[in-house]
Swiss-Prot record:
InterPro entries: DUF2115. Belongs to the UPF0305 family. It holds the Pfam family DUF2115. It comes from Methanococcus maripaludis (strain C6 / ATCC BAA-1332). This is UPF0305 protein MmarC6_0221.
Length: 162
């Protein structure tokens, strides 16, 4: 699939994510993060619900002509979507969360090629993603690499490579 065609699809999907979806996604994620330490959970939610709506706006404001046109492996898109569908728990607000995450994550991975977390996100141990010389380094890249995560699709390298 051509990147511009995929971007057009994502742009259409971005208009399907409304304020109620954002509210439902927040309710869902708050429940899903119940057992995390409160200070970590609070920061993660703030970063997530600042970053993801910003990326949605970015998608809505970009034109197809601004996107470099290249081939995207459709199997990779299906693999990412499948992983997103398998993440987290089942809940009433899951559909809203999934709609938001699929649109934003696919854009970040395949079109914009940026980290999947905001650069301000604090991970356990207080570490953050670092940008250096146009490369991104993540403190949890290798720790989270498994068949259920989407880390393998992220542009970040492991922090230990820095």
């Amino acid at each position: 699939m051509k990147s511009r065609n995929f971007f057009s699809k994502l742009k259409e999907e971005s208009y399907d994510v409304g304020i109620f979806d954002l509210m439902n996604a927040k309710v869902y994620l708050e429940k899903d993060l119940t057992y995390l330490p409160e200070d970590y959970k609070k920061g993660y939610l703030e970063d997530f619900f600042t970053f993801f709506p910003e990326v949605l706006r970015e998608i809505k404001n970009k034109t197809e002509e601004e996107i470099e046109d290249f081939e995207i492996n459709e199997e990779e898109i299906k693999k990412v979507d499948s992983r997103i569908c398998s993440m987290g728990s089942i809940g009433a607000s899951r559909d809203s969360y999934e709609k938001l995450v699929k649109t934003v994550i696919n854009y970040l991975i395949f079109i914009n090629k940026r980290p999947l977390h905001a650069l301000t996100t604090r991970f356990p141990g207080g570490k953050q993603i670092i940008e250096k010389n146009g490369n991104y380094y993540c403190p949890i890249k290798n720790a989270q690499s498994n068949e259920l995560s989407i880390c393998e699709f992220c542009i970040c390298k492991d922090l230990n490579e820095l």
